[in-house]
């Protein structure tokens, strides 16, 4: 059996698995596992409001995205035309790949959102019966996103590969692979708006709900009296399901494209389709490993949910390492040469394994810094005894400190992969890190589903036993979400470096001198970009949160009887505020990321652009890790105080709520969005590389 058949079979297997999980989740009918008619009616009402809000946002977001996709597709057609690829129009086929990537990413987001909003109420329903049943429903809901997205991504890439190579068998493979890179650009363009727009939406609602509800009115989280509570629950789906999904879809597509572009420059790989498609085989064989691992997802009534989820990550990592040994032995050529370096099949395999285990260790380190089972978060909780200021100081310190070990792990991965297999090894290491994406994304999507289930249980007043079960599920989801963010940032760093390597290969830039003014100027400018981007997204959350706070205060003042539960708040108004703010505020950060590499490359040339990419990568990775982990630390310090220390309502808890509110945009908007910044700038540079080689450096040409 050849690699093409296997890749298609595995992608179809993933899609079928997603369909099976969809049927499992939707087969549960609300109201069949206990409770009275009034409870069932409430459950369905709340679930419907969350679903409608989420889908309304997604539809409006996709309308805005479609305008950007159309603009970028036209730009690609106009600017790309490689004179070396006679008979093959680079611009048109890159644009086709670009639109395909964007479309598949949008479809994946839609499917994930649809099933998450169906799974949340069913998880709450299952929690009436048992913890084990509720866990399984939330996990199965996440699995639809995990397997569906990976299956569609791999199928999309292999179909485009077959179309391009089938239509143009005489054209050199590296030209075709460069056009295929458009697929990664499309996926990442959607991820940009999914992450930024979704992040602004979810945190505007969250901050508004917390500041007025918890701090001013002293009512608990997800209380139905809080006007922003539905918007808050909608935001969990918008940011953590659609946003995270699009982010990892982009990483998968971009790392694959980078490896294909670099690999296609080696004649031994170009001459063997099986060996050339090795990058796709890594993602493809991650699917059966993830399916086998998913059977282990079981918890008992008093079982440790967090351990059950972490076992998924560890077992899938070991399975992929074992499976890929035999895949490498069978499909990879014995040796090949790239840029004068001879690389063996085992150099490639070790690079993949190093990336794979590096991802796992980054997850372990992230857990240490963000879980309240360990010292760093408990120190933040302890610091809350002396007020919000010391809580914030300790939280910032935690974030900065937490970036040290992940960066060292990334350095070890990069150096090892580069020594063994050059730039190709770095791309393969990135693919190794995200080879378990199906199970990783399943666990990530599990988090917001169980969080929503808790919110629905609280609003529907299902009783303490049900809420205790959903709280346990949610607590585990919080820790695994932090691990997922660390994993996403690590994979973004390696993916971005792989794309940078492909860009250097593509533009024939053999060496870059740091002291060269063009390069150093680019480095400085690039290092500034993540901070500018973070400032823009932080302020956007702040502006949207101010609107939300004013609306919530207004409703408490103008609608009589909200606090007594006699009248319902106007939930829809808060949903509209979050939606409008997110769509309005995501435009400028989006333009910054998409247009910067095009303008820098055209005006200052390839060397300056290479400096910009390197600077943005180095500064962005450290900033993203510290922001995500500070936010995670503040969040779990608050939860630790609620469960183990001073308890809700204490001065210690009030200080921790302020820290948690400050941390919200850190961990759910700015931190994760930097992933997209570093990846999207790199893939944009790769796609437009030929244009920069031919037309770039306008400013220097004028002055020379």
UniProtKB/Swiss-Prot annotation:
Topological category with respect to the lipid bilayer: Multi-pass membrane protein
Keyword Magnesium: yes
Swiss-Prot/TrEMBL site (Important for potassium dependence) positions: 481
A GO molecular-function annotation: magnesium ion binding
EC class (word): translocase
Cell location: Cell inner membrane
EC number(s) from the headed UniProt entry: 7.2.3.1
Keyword terms, alphabetized: Calcium, Cell inner membrane, Cell membrane, Ion transport, Magnesium, Membrane, Metal-binding, Potassium, Sodium, Sodium transport, Translocase, Transmembrane, Transmembrane helix, Transport
Annotated site, Important for ion transport, chain positions: 195, 240, 247, 668, 679
Residues annotated for Ca(2+) binding in this entry: 635, 660, 664
InterPro entries: PPase-energised_H-pump
GO CC entries: plasma membrane
Record carries keyword Nucleotide-binding: no
Catalytic activity: Na(+)(in) + diphosphate + H2O = Na(+)(out) + 2 phosphate + H(+)
Binding site for Mg(2+) 2: 233, 236, 451
Activity regulation as described: Requires K(+) for maximal activity.
Required co-factors: Mg(2+)
Residues bound to Mg(2+) 1: 206, 210
Stretches that traverse the bilayer: 3-23, 64-84, 91-111, 144-164, 174-194, 276-296, 313-333, 346-366, 387-407, 429-449, 483-503, 514-534, 586-606, 608-628, 680-700
Role of this protein: Sodium pump that utilizes the energy of pyrophosphate hydrolysis as the driving force for Na(+) movement across the membrane.
Subunit structure comment from the entry: Homodimer.
Identification of the protein by name: Putative K(+)-stimulated pyrophosphate-energized sodium pump
